């Protein structure tokens, strides 16, 4: 959101058939989780930016830190219970993950591949970050994809019928 130099990547990903979801505009936990209204103001801001690129506001969301984050209660106690319900009331679906590459902390490509390929659920939503400084994620991704394809997994764009991973909400 706050990095307009990457805005054109939204359209490029969309044109390649990827589902575009929203995270936040600011990714500032103190701002986003200051109140329910603050969360939706930030979400609306990223929604408007995405709409300029692809022609509509996506209905798929991932909360900063996931729905199970414990940071939000530092700013507003109980906010996650309200937000998970309210995003669905507004017609959106939020996604968490049931597998993580571990790229939220600095790791080598080999460590990311080992972590990301350690899951064996029927449906896997794997958390990887595409932000600045995640070159090891970019390097690991082909190996991760190859691993799961060799096990018979398929990769599909999310839609309303996709498997949804939800964490337990922490307030």
Where does each model-flagged region fall?
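Active-site beta-loop-alpha junctions enriched in small/polar residues
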Residues: 1, 25, 64-66, 99-102, ...
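Structural recognition of the beta-strand scaffold that forms the well-ordered cores
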Residues: 19-24, 59-63, 93-98, 124-128, ...
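Short amphipathic alpha-helical segments and helix-helix/interface helices
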Residues: 7-11, 81-85, 142-145
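Alpha-helical scaffold elements lining the catalytic groove of polysaccharide deacetylases
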Residues: 28-54, 69-123, 134-140
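Accessory recognition modules or surfaces
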Residues: 1-6, 15-16, 105-127, 134-136, ...
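C-terminal domain-boundary segment and adjacent tail
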Residues: 133-171
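Active-site beta->alpha N-cap acidic-glycine motif
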Residues: 1-57, 147, 163
């Amino acid at each position: 959101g706050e990095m307009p130099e990457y805005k054109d990547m939204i359209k490029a990903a969309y044109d390649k058939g990827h589902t575009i979801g929203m995270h936040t505009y600011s990714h500032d936990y103190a701002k986003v989780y200051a109140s329910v209204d603050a969360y939706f103001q930030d979400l609306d801001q990223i929604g408007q930016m995405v709409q300029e690129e692809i022609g509509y506001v996506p209905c798929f969301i991932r909360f900063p830190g996931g729905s199970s984050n414990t940071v939000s209660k530092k700013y507003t106690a109980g906010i996650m219970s309200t937000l998970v319900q309210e995003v669905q009331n507004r017609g959106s679906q939020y996604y968490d993950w049931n597998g993580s590459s571990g790229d939220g902390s600095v790791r080598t490509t080999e460590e990311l591949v080992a972590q990301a390929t350690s899951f064996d659920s029927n449906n896997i939503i794997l958390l990887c970050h595409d932000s600045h400084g995640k070159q090891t994620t970019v390097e690991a991704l082909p190996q991760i994809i190859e691993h799961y394809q060799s096990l018979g997994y398929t990769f599909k764009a999310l839609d309303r019928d996709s498997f949804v991973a939800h964490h337990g909400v922490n307030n």
